[in-house]
């Protein structure tokens, strides 16, 4: 019984450690409004951010504007 408890606790600590590392790695990006994207954002935002703004990715948000994700 004690071995099961120790194994379960070790697994839980490993999961928490990995989850913390994921949060830290995601925190190295910033999302900014695309500077040269014109018009309402329905599509093509990702391609625009990658090619024109030098960003990692782009997405249309709820406000129908193009937001680019860059390394901070």
UniProtKB/Swiss-Prot annotation:
What upregulates this protein?
Answer: Upon contact with the plant pathogen fungus Fusarium solani.
Any GO BP: killing of cells of another organism
UniProt keyword terms in alphabetical order? Antimicrobial, Disulfide bond, Fungicide, Pathogenesis-related protein, Plant defense, Secreted, Signal
Q: Where in the cell is it found?
A: Secreted
Q: Where are the transmembrane segments?
A: none
Q: Which residues form the signal peptide?
A: 1-27
> In terms of one coarse class, where is the protein primarily found?
secreted
Q: Which family does it belong to?
A: Belongs to the DEFL family.
- Protein name as it appears in the record: Defensin-like protein 230
């Amino acid at each position: 019984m004690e071995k099961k408890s120790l194994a379960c606790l070790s697994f839980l600590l490993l999961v928490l450690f990995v989850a913390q590392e994921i949060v830290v790695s995601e925190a190295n990006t910033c999302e900014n409004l695309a500077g040269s994207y014109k018009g309402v954002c329905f599509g093509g935002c990702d391609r625009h951010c990658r090619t024109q703004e030098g960003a990692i990715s782009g997405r249309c948000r709820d406000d129908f504007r193009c937001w680019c994700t860059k390394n901070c």
